Amino acid sequence: MILEHVLVLSAYLFSIGIYGLITSRNMVRALMCLELILNAVNINFVTFSDFFDNRQLKGDIFSIFVIAIAAAEAAIGLAIVSSIYRNRKSTRINQSNLLNN
């Protein structure tokens, strides 16, 4: 694959994730957009590792580390969202003002 094509794909995914994160009103959708951003970053890590560092797997290993952190973040985020849904009966970001009772 050509380096520019992969970087353009990653930039599109990153841009879609940022747009979705900014415009999202639902917490689950915001978590999905955050995962999309992290996957775009992983594509960059693997691509640059493949093109510029053929013998060492630093980018690939770091990408696996980011995937593990993203899985933990998704699990904790979904647990928080389900807890907020049980209390407030809504997953909308603007209605989750838990600090002012």
Curated annotation (Swiss-Prot):
Which parts of the chain span the membrane according to its record? 2-22, 32-52, 61-81
Please state what the protein is called: NAD(P)H-quinone oxidoreductase subunit 4L, chloroplastic
Disulfide pairs here are none
Molecular function (GO) terms for this protein are: oxidoreductase activity, acting on NAD(P)H, quinone or similar compound as acceptor; quinone binding
Q: Where is the signal peptide?
A: none
Q: How does it sit in the membrane?
A: Multi-pass membrane protein
Any one Pfam family here would be Oxidored_q2
Q: Where in the cell is it found?
A: Plastid, Chloroplast thylakoid membrane
Q: Which GO terms describe its cellular component?
A: chloroplast thylakoid membrane; NADH dehydrogenase complex
Q: So what does this one do?
A: NDH shuttles electrons from NAD(P)H:plastoquinone, via FMN and iron-sulfur (Fe-S) centers, to quinones in the photosynthetic chain and possibly in a chloroplast respiratory chain. The immediate electron acceptor for the enzyme in this species is believed to be plastoquinone. Couples the redox reaction to proton translocation, and thus conserves the redox energy in a proton gradient.
Q: Which family does it belong to?
A: Belongs to the complex I subunit 4L family.
**EC number from the UniProt entry:** 7.1.1.-
